């Protein structure tokens, strides 16, 4: 008995020894009593594969992040009430342990409303279909379900001892999400709801602080935080709450038909440096890796399958240079200043014209920022006896208040130019061979046969429970020969919120309609021939992601809302027959999905591309549909929806883990509107060339991401002009041959590092101009 007690005591002491105390004061998050500068990045586990997670998280750490932040996706984990899924890339615990194994912290945003451009904001549609349900307010049914899911997630994480208070990586947890943006629409019920959220979260006793983002009135002890492109002017609602930024948008999401969003590297860096200049101490990038909206997870509506987000890591996990490298350099500088930023006394010097210097002073030393918020005018100032040139819309950082170590507008990191290459698998045929199987729709077109029947037009979510993008609405109309609506000039008029609509009368396709993004309520009308006797009307409603944002967004309709009319015209007379209360039959989905034809071995087969570079499938020539690789749903495709030459891409991510490295691979396509698959092909994506434009007294680092540098296309030290791919020599140039030096130092190597100085490249008579080394290398 004595021996057993001793063993139990040792276990308890050992467990407690590894616990981390996470708290906060008005200056910073504290870890084991020490104030910390914390830099975090969002990586959503379902938007990549389990095989990608270690590399993505490792690159986050190598980018000098401290933490990885993720949402928890309710509808992915509980697609059917009380039936849970944590398999594959939904294995939240495995993801959190991967973060832990890399020695990083975790930030767990449970929500469980997530927005995130995710289908229905992460809410399961069965929740909407519960009687009397209202989302995100003091609705008993909603609060019960939210508490059930939140508690389940917390208990799962506790069981694996993953909160910092248990020795795990999670230092912060989040309840709700951006509710402050919509709280006004809910009145007093909204205020009561957010108080309930705080009380419920606090009762779960996770042992780390809870945060609420975009919630100015977040109840204590919740920490309110900021989301946006810039949060330097944000002020917490409590003097004991540190200044925290949970979403620094590194780019933006993409809509079908839209252009690729882009946020400059310089602007992201400026926003971060400005935030820390103005007393911020926790910052998270949304996104650090965006990834892919596999299957039907994209929300919106009209959010694309790619969720690249112009993040520091691209959709495939490649370094998005120069964004990744320029931010890493910023992180290193901020970490080096951690003590002065979190403990120093703060003073500010105003130079006018939107230029300020901020000094953080401790007994050991000082660190300084010089910020120029003027968007057009560079600044030349004298600060503490030294002259500094600060470009417009930039921040210079002086860790010792003397030497400028970093400026947000001066990029010294390489730019990587990514290229796509054809599949070079051994013995791969130049074209794919295809087999075809048509979708069997006779039962719905000619018989109007469905799974359920009601005398009402229902919202698609109610009938389909979001089990499919596709819902058939069918009715049979008996017209007598003397019916006044019958005639030569007839049409079918449909009031609809379907994102895409196909209409059939008596088995004939009379037309289709695709809505413009944002204009989801419309009237479709098309000429149609009706006959005396029975006429079968079949409408196929298609959704392209359910709404994920807004007050009461659960009430945004999808499908055939009605009314539906047969219109007859006889001279100047218009006769209208309302079919809205007819007997309507409903059928969810398509037979090919139900019969799992996507797992068939009969469609096109091909060999996996050689090597380890990311793989894409180019679906140019196709219309709209869904694609599967070896039974894995890689998401919706819609190359036919091109707004202009800068619009949607026809290339879709195929994770390497979906491929068979030996033997054949199977591609299955469901093509909805028709297309030509002869152009479909597989490609790999890798670094084709790298460029750099590095200021003197910095280090040039070139890397071809595991491939050798094969040639130096351009090199000049002085004041070269142009951009990557079009560099040209300037008015002054160093005496030594820069191209020859770089050829000797770099060609044949996977990476190289060179000091940019006159000692290396020779004198350049450039006067007062800042000297730079411009390089373009071929990989």
From Swiss-Prot:
Active site feature: 178 (proton donor), 247 (nucleophile)
* Protein's name in the database: Beta-galactosidase 15
The record's Gene Ontology cellular component field reads: apoplast
Its signal peptide is 1-19
**UniProt EC number:** 3.2.1.23
The residues that carry sugar chains are 148, 248, 345, 374, 489, 495, 555
Q: What organism is the protein native to?
A: Arabidopsis thaliana
**Annotated localization:** Secreted, Extracellular space, Apoplast
Major site of localization recorded for this protein: secreted
- For this UniProt record, give its keywords in alphabetical order, as a comma-separated list: Apoplast, Glycoprotein, Glycosidase, Hydrolase, Secreted, Signal
Q: Which residues form the SUEL-type lectin domain?
A: 694-779
Question: Which example biological process does GO assign this protein?
Answer: carbohydrate metabolic process
Q: Name one Pfam family in it.
A: BetaGal_gal-bd
């Amino acid at each position: 008995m004595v021996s057993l007690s001793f063993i139990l005591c040792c276990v308890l002491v050992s467990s407690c020894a590894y616990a981390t105390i996470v708290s906060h004061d008005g200056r910073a998050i504290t870890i084991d009593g020490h104030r910390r500068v914390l830099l975090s990045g969002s990586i959503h586990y379902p938007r990549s594969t389990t095989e990608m997670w270690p590399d993505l998280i490792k690159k986050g750490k190598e980018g000098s992040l401290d933490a990885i932040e993720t949402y928890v996706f309710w509808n992915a984990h509980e697609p059917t009430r009380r039936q849970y899924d944590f398999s594959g890339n939904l294995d939240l615990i495995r993801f959190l342990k991967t973060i832990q194994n890399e020695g990083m912290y975790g930030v767990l945003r449970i929500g469980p409303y997530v927005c995130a451009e995710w289908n229905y904001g992460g809410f399961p549609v069965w929740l909407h279909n519960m009687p009397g349900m209202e989302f995100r307010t003091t609705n008993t049914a909603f609060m019960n379900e939210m508490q059930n899911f939140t508690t389940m997630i917390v208990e799962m994480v506790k069981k694996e001892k993953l909160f910092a208070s248990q020795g795990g990586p999670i230092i912060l947890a989040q309840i709700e999400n951006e509710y402050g943006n919509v709280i006004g629409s809910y009145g007093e019920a909204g205020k009561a709801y957010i108080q309930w959220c705080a009380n419920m979260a606090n009762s779960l006793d996770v042992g780390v602080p809870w945060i609420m983002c975009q919630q100015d009135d977040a109840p204590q002890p919740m920490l309110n935080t900021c989301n946006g492109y810039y949060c330097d002017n944000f002020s917490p609602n409590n003097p004991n709450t540190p200044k925290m930024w949970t979403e620094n948008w590194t780019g933006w999401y993409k809509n079908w038909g839209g252009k690729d969003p882009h946020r400059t590297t310089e602007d992201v860096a400026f926003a971060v440096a400005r935030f820390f200049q103005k007393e911020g101490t926790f910052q998270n990038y949304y996104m650090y890796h965006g990834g892919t909206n596999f299957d039907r997870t994209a929300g919106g509506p009209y959010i694309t399958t790619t969720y690249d987000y112009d993040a520091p890591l691209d959709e495939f996990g490649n370094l998005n240079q120069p964004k990744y490298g320029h931010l890493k350099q910023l992180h290193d500088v901020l970490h080096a200043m951690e003590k002065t930023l979190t403990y120093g006394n703060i003073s500010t010097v105003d130079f006018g014209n939107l230029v300020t210097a901020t000094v953080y002073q401790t007994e050991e030393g000082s660190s300084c920022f010089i910020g120029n918020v003027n968007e057009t005018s560079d600044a030349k100032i004298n600060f503490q006896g030294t002259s500094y040139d600060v470009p417009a819309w930039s921040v210079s950082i002086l860790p010792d208040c003397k030497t400028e170590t970093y400026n947000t507008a001066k990029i010294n990191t390489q730019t990587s130019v990514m290229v796509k290459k054809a599949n070079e698998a051994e013995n791969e045929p130049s074209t794919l061979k295809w087999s075809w199987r048509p979708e069997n729709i006779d039962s719905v077109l000619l018989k109007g046969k469905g799974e359920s029947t009601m005398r009402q037009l229902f919202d698609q979510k109610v009938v389909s429970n979001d089990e499919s993008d596709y819902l058939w609405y069918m009715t049979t109309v008996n017209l007598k020969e003397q019916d006044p609506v019958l005639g030569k000039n007839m049409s079918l008029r449909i009031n609809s919120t379907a994102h895409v609509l196909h209409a059939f009368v008596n088995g004939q396709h009379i037309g289709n309609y695709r809505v413009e993004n944002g204009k989801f309520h419309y009237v479709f009308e098309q000429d149609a021939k009706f006959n005396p006797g029975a006429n079968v009307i079949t409408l196929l409603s298609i959704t392209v992601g359910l709404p994920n944002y807004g007050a009461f967004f659960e009430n945004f309709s999808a499908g055939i809302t009605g009314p539906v009319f047969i219109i007859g015209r006889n001279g100047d007379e218009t006769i209208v027959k309302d079919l809205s209360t007819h007997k309507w039959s409903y059928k969810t989905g398509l037979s090919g999905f139900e019969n799992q034809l996507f797992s068939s071995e009969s469609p096109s087969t091909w060999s996996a591309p050689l090597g380890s570079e990311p793989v894409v499938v180019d679906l140019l020539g196709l219309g709209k549909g869904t694609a599967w690789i070896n039974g894995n749903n890689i998401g919706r495709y819609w190359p036919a929806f091109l707004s202009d030459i800068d619009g949607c891409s026809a290339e879709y991510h195929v994770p390497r883990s979906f491929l068979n490295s030996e033997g054949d691979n199977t591609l299955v396509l469901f093509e909805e509107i028709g297309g030509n698959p002869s152009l479909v092909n597989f490609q790999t994506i890798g670094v084709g060339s790298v460029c750099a434009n590095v200021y003197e007294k910095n280090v040039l680092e070139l890397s071809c991401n595991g491939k050798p540098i094969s040639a130096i296309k351009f090199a000049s030290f002085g004041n070269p002009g142009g951009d990557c791919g079009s560099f040209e020599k300037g008015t002054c140039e160093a005496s030594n041959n820069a191209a020859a030096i770089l050829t000797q130092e770099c060609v044949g190597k996977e990476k190289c590092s060179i000091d940019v100085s006159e000692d290396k490249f020779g004198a350049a008579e450039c006067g007062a101009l800042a000297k730079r080394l411009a390089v373009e290398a071929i990989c």
